[in-house]
Amino acid sequence: MLQVRRWSGFLALGLLLVSCRDGSDPVSPTLAARVDQGAQGSREQAARWFEAASPEALAVPGAVYADLREESNRLEFGVLHLGAEAAVRAAARRLGIPDDAVTVVLAEPIVQMASLRDKWRPTQGGIQIHFGLYLCTMGFNADDGTQRSFITNSHCTNKQGGVESTKYYQPTSTVDPTVIATEAEDPTYFKGGVCPRGRRCRYSDAARALYSSGTSSSRGIIAKTSGPNNGSLNVTGNFTITSQDNTTTSFGIGTTVNKVGRTTGWTQGNVTQTCVNVNVSGSTITQLCQSIVQNPGGAVVIGGGDSGSQMFQITSGDNVTLVGIAWGGNSSGTMLVFSPFKQIQQELGSLVATQ
């Protein structure tokens, strides 16, 4: 269920935590088409052979999997190389299993897929965090002087604006009840001056959490999925923050920016409006001088739970420049709003986010 805060067509996007379980998808290996032909034994005989052969075959270096193929009553073993094939066949012969009851195929290694929603130590930008009943995204790790911290949204605290010592968990308190960090800085929203009558304002939807001493973190690292706007949450590498934009508040129209968040993964779009004053729907909050991003192809760029995602520009390869923090968007997720990094520092103080 989404935590939805409506304001003038935009949404502040956190995610209500109801329950969590392991949602990993099974891995389907890609196999070479090398299959031996031979006699088929009875199902009962094949099952006895498989029970004996599986542990022996999987003990062979280079073995990938063991399977009893129900449609043929044959034993199938996946291996990485021909050397392993010979060893697997020898193991089967020692058990008295005829060669024509055994199939060996070349298989790719099967690896565990780590998701943005899994437990990560050291922590890094883009992964899931949990507080209270809600889920958000860890934006980026940063040092505030000697204080090792991470930055997320102000609305990803127990109360938006002001410090209530919100406790954070990763990925959730049910998976790991260790408090990884505690809210340390979240300026109150101001009234008057440039702030519209009857509303409360800030220039960034950002808060800082101070890490617990026992939690390891990687400054300057953002989790990277397989590609932009493809919906994948599986981490395939990382981006490195090599620079941070301490000066820009108004980004050029058409500037390409990216984010990584726990719900929609790595998304990319272009700045379509810059230094926009935005009313947060369903609240009295106005965020001043924000940037708006859309994907030219209409792709979804943000979803519930992506709140807190870092915003960055790719400079070369996997090296990136940190430019801000995402906090909201429209109901369809095709538009996101972010606070420039310069304004985050104006409100939270000097931060070092580079590796």
Go through the PLM ranges and name each one.
Residues 1-9:
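Bacterial N-terminal signal peptides that target proteins for export
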Residues 16-19:
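C-terminal motif of bacterial Sec signal peptides marking the signal peptidase cleavage site
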Residues 43-62:
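Short amphipathic alpha-helix segments
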Residues 58-90, 94:
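Short glycine/threonine-rich beta-strand-turn micro-motifs
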